[in-house]
């Protein structure tokens, strides 16, 4: 301190030593006021002076009335004193307080600068200030001090500059290291080796290894020899960037430069190699250390032991432990924990426990980590008895059981189904004052979801909210996945929406799970729309996403849509997998596009490894199901030619196809031949096919034989086999034989299943055994089996067959109320029955129910309703049904429209009939000439000859060719009205239209002529008919005989008729007499008898 004040009152002190002694005495007794009366002079400061300055500062700041500026000045003076007295730590502390008190770095610098010359200080005070700022992470402030120092002609030391450089690099501040270096050189601050080390580290971190090598060369040329730190820095980055060859070359370069690698160098290299899963090379470096006489330490061995343990090579890790012990090195917790974890991962609990006890024998107390590793491994491998023992041991030894250990145990218990014990452990965890985290709760939720206890999982989610946590993305994904797995798709979507609202990031796993579930539920269009929405939200579908959607369309048989998605998939750059191709082929096969499927399979042979046994099996199975066995056998041969070996499924598919076609004997021979060649072994599925085929063929004894053969070969018949037998008995009408099969089903996967009951229900329903059907339905409910649409159909079928239609409707309503799916076939059956019984209103009510359930009308339903409505003269309702069919894209049969036109004409509503005719033409139900002809016939049938004739002429004028039936009907009306000549004129018109008479037309004209007594012309037509290749029927002969018998005079035609009747076998020669009239009467009786028998 350089204060020069003279006070006359203390002039008696003659020497400097006496003055110093007096000041010291006054200061030590805290009589600060006496200092104002003393005379000062310049002297070198020592440690004691710094201490006194601090003591004085503490006294001053406690004095009242001091202004901030005075305090700052005193603090700065004290800092200068401390720096000159080399008391750097107190100086740092004061500067830290001053920087916090003042805020701005420029203010602190200015305050120090103001007192700098007063105290004859030195620049190191600013070095300390810079380091204070760096230690507090205030890099910008340190750079500001560096700048201000330059303005006043001061330079910090190179060590301070290195500290700034190092801090800038670590912090990642937006400050250029190279700009700072340039400023250093500009201010002639000479860099040292440490400076170069920092710069080399920066270049290596950026991957600029060439520049770092150049800098090292520049460093050497400038007289700075790279140290071990320099080389270690470069080696570290070589290893981190995977340039291990360059690292080894640098090691050799170090040796050539006389810089020996130390144990830290090798430890760093080994650590980086192990982290990059190159543990074998790390072990070679250990051997290299030995050769270079560098002794590995505990860190070296721990790194390698941990690396080998993580890689599953615990035996090598154990050998390294023995080597470590042989060199006198002491393994620590890290060593044993790695070995315990390694042995546990391999499932070798005996060795893991040996390591644990060895650790204790070495005097090392197992830590929470040691126990945690052991407990986690034991729980994962379901060794819960051992785990419980070590858990209690931790408690006894006072080792704190932490959150990670508890979570590991809870996770292991949950994964192995010990959920209640997991909950108990959770409660113990809370009692120990350890709050479960989101990972702990996630393990519990996953465990409960896995076993289907979804309600409990949701309760745990509520508990998460109660403790102030929020479910993370993993928990949401777990809930969504398990909801989808259990078929609760609506709940899964609701959870997904909650996940979005919570702001969690959607991942591909959750996305693909939802897409797959939507496809499985048959909602493939919704799945595609969901994928579009995800794409618009920025989550692009991956290959799995596209595969899920293509598979969905494939399963539903929508091959074209599957290919559309495939095109989009390839367009965005995703490569199809063998699963993609399989789904596309499946889509074509299920959609019935077998020819296209065959072509697609052939094209896939050009794609490497795309065609395998599964692909061929897909197409072969589809061919078998479609009944195209020849093609299936051809595909089988093609497989063998292409060296694609058929598997058990291939043979089973072919055998099943043959059995379905009733070629069970061929299937058996094929199976025996394949078995003899060693291509396939007899299996349960194969014999089930034989049993099913034999029973369906009515060969129930042969079916029983194959059932017994299954037992002899050790293939226990399952419920599928028994169901095949029950179905066979039911089809043969021998359903009573199933009573012997039902008791033995108790041992087959829990007894009769829904398929069993449905088969029995259908069988008893066809027999109209309603009471047994209801007993079977009661058994379904009592056994906890959910009925399906087939159950409903079979039960309603029996009731309908028993003419209890009203009860059938009530049962249908009950099924719908219970949420059972009812199919279109059940509705069609009931609607047809309602229509047949004349209960049209009931039929319409059923149609309304169908519509409300989203089941559209089909052609069979509509046709049945139209027919009954027409019969009951409810023509307006009939038109409504026909219109509804058109709206739904169902093309009604033309005969339904024709029936409606006939009915309308019959009741005299000609105007509406013409409207319906126009609708037929407009909707393209049939060609215009057919529609117009139908109108002609309808008018003729209701006796409106003039209108019919007028319409016929209009048709001819419009160049529309009437049908033969319309001409025939009009000719029949003419003949009926006695206008045979007009009928014959119509025949001429027919001929002009290019139409020929058919058998009915000939019969109409012949009957009309006979009725008029014109037998000559009638027989002329008869001969013409025979010439056109038509064989006369009973109607023809009866008309001719009736005409002949009505004649009073003989006619030669009688002999012709009798001769033809005799030739055709209608009469015999034994029954003929000489009287033609009598013979004709006898022939008439014979013909009447024949027609009567035919009607019966």
Swiss-Prot record:
UniProt PPR repeat ranges: 122-156, 157-191, 192-226, 227-261, 262-296, 297-331, 332-366, 367-401, 402-436, 437-471, 472-506, 507-541, 542-576, 577-607, 612-646, 647-681, 683-717, 718-752, 753-787, 788-822, 823-857, 858-892, 893-927, 928-962, 963-997, 998-1032, 1033-1068
TM region positions: none
Alphabetic keyword roster: Repeat
Gene3D superfamilies (alphabetical): Tetratricopeptide repeat domain (1.25.40.10)
PANTHER family recorded: MEMBRANE-ASSOCIATED SALT-INDUCIBLE PROTEIN-LIKE (PTHR47939), OS04G0684500 PROTEIN (PTHR47939:SF1)
Family: Belongs to the PPR family. P subfamily.
Record-linked NCBIfam families: PPR
Name of the featured protein: Pentatricopeptide repeat-containing protein At5g55840
Organism: Arabidopsis thaliana (Mouse-ear cress)
